[in-house]
């Protein structure tokens, strides 16, 4: 058996393979993730949306932000140097000699495989004359030629070559280790051990420990754990939080505390500027002593948020702090929504009366505060202030107009172009076009709702205690798209009909957001009563004439009766025959109708089965898509005049009972709605049968006044009784019966054998 030898690389050839692979594993992923993206694409995108978003704060900050030219250049230089090193090593590896080469005697003698013995001898003579040492040839080459000649002519050498790959028989196998020899040299052992100890015992633990202690302070949504604890405590303490209390709790987040977040700053000038803003804002509940809500950082964050909602001008030194605080608000409010939902679930699972769940109003106030923070508006301000060039002074002209009383954005969109231009006459043409462009970019989302019980035979039958699944299909369009469709419909209806009916333009369809016009009320005077038609009264005859008429009628009636009896006797035979034929035809018709009804029932059942199968396949595909797909959270940019960061349109979808003010299903944060999105909301059915009225809410986290509400009716039935006898449960009994039958058969067979033996 061949021996084995392990040797370190003295020449460095094997080490180049290892080094090339190592550099390639670093350079290729680093190029994919760290290569600077094209800056021109972002500039082109900003240029295309300038008409709509040009006045937004985040857009102006993006343009004013200095372009980081040095960092992309440094990244490119480092990556190009890495690729140069990788290519150099690859070239070096391609030029190095192979460590292991298969021995081929034909190649040594410069012959083709399969040459004859005569050709081998002839070639050997020529090469031996050329490389013989006595004639000044190469001794090493001559030895190789002699060895190759022996491998092809000597039977034993040829056999060794065919079996072991070498004419001399099995050789020792050497394995090269891809490390240079100086690493294992005894002279360098102390230095190598020092480097290994420094790398694995000092640097690696420090890096891993610092990363661990830094990441353990944050949750999965990059929110400080301490912030979540603060929100949980105050939400549990205050069951019903109004907007003022909610702002206080929001400002108490540790993200605004310089002790826990290095990005949060505290300046000496805050002691002068913050009290000035407090005097301008008014009362902000400074008397309560509730740390950390009364800490300086929390007070500063609260004042900056209130000044933002009031659209107040603040000193330049506080603008940067305000922008930092506003960027954190959407994520913090989402965390507060999660905390409220967790407390509601805990209250449902516990039967303790002392543990009270937060109210639905607290949850909805969190969502409203997110809209307010993004748009920079107070709670009861008009949603029209989200539009450009519409201020408090201009708003009065719009909302208090004699003819058009516009309160919401939908009311403004539903107007005709001429009426809208008349209403906004105080705007110049350029400003009016900008307002219309912004108004057309606002989202309009429709909801299609379907409730069912999945994994059940009758999915449409909702029973007590079942898990109800409400499938909501969201379709997003812009206000401009919907309005253009309605304008085209109205224009088509206004055209005169060809048949001359000119009243078709009276019944015009209106959009989903348009208010239904109430017709004129009918007064009592306008109602005209139709005259009642009088029935003709019969003419009364004298009594003597009536008796004579009755007698005459009686005589005539007797004669007619006799004639009718004779006709009946003559027609009895023909009537009986007709009745028999009618019975036969009627029975045939009944049989045909029964077959048709059975066929229709079978077709209907097959269609129902196909529909159920398709729904099942669609639900399976939907679940697989939800598990495998990773949709981007970049949907559509939000138009916000005073928000410092580009924000995407996200929504909250949930089901609630408005009458009982309870939350039915947990809010689902829709972050991937670009055009259409399907969302499943699941909740347990009520414990008692009956009809229930719920409401499906779709709330934006960025826009005010664009929430959608749709009713949901549920008819809950009694739960089906558990079947006591089922065919699947009879398998054990059938098995016992089969076993008894087999045993009886064996007993009878044994008795027959015994009788035959007795006869013998």
UniProtKB/Swiss-Prot annotation:
UniProt feature, compositional bias: Basic and acidic residues: 582-608
Cytoplasmic membrane side: 36-69, 210-760
Sequence positions bearing Phosphothreonine: 537
Signal sequence residues: none
Transmembrane segments: 15-35, 70-90, 189-209
InterPro entries, alphabetized: C2_domain_sf (IPR035892), DnaJ_domain (IPR001623), Ig_E-set (IPR014756), J_dom_sf (IPR036869), Sec63-dom (IPR004179)
Family matches, as PROSITE patterns: DNAJ_2
Bias-annotated ranges (Basic residues): 518-536
Residue span of region Disordered: 492-617, 720-760
Residue ranges annotated as Lumenal topological domain: 1-14, 91-188
Superkingdom field: Eukaryota
Coiled coil location: 597-635
GO molecular function, one term: signaling receptor activity
Disease: Polycystic liver disease 2 with or without kidney cysts: An autosomal dominant hepatobiliary disease characterized by overgrowth of biliary epithelium and supportive connective tissue, resulting in multiple liver cysts. A subset of patients may develop kidney cysts that usually do not result in clinically significant renal disease.
Subunit structure: The ER translocon complex consists of channel-forming core components SEC61A1, SEC61B and SEC61G and different auxiliary components such as SEC62 and SEC63.
Function: Mediates cotranslational and post-translational transport of certain precursor polypeptides across endoplasmic reticulum (ER). Proposed to play an auxiliary role in recognition of precursors with short and apolar signal peptides. May cooperate with SEC62 and HSPA5/BiP to facilitate targeting of small presecretory proteins into the SEC61 channel-forming translocon complex, triggering channel opening for polypeptide translocation to the ER lumen. Required for efficient PKD1/Polycystin-1 biogenesis and trafficking to the plasma membrane of the primary cilia.
Name of this chain's protein: Translocation protein SEC63 homolog
The organism of origin for this protein: Homo sapiens (Human)
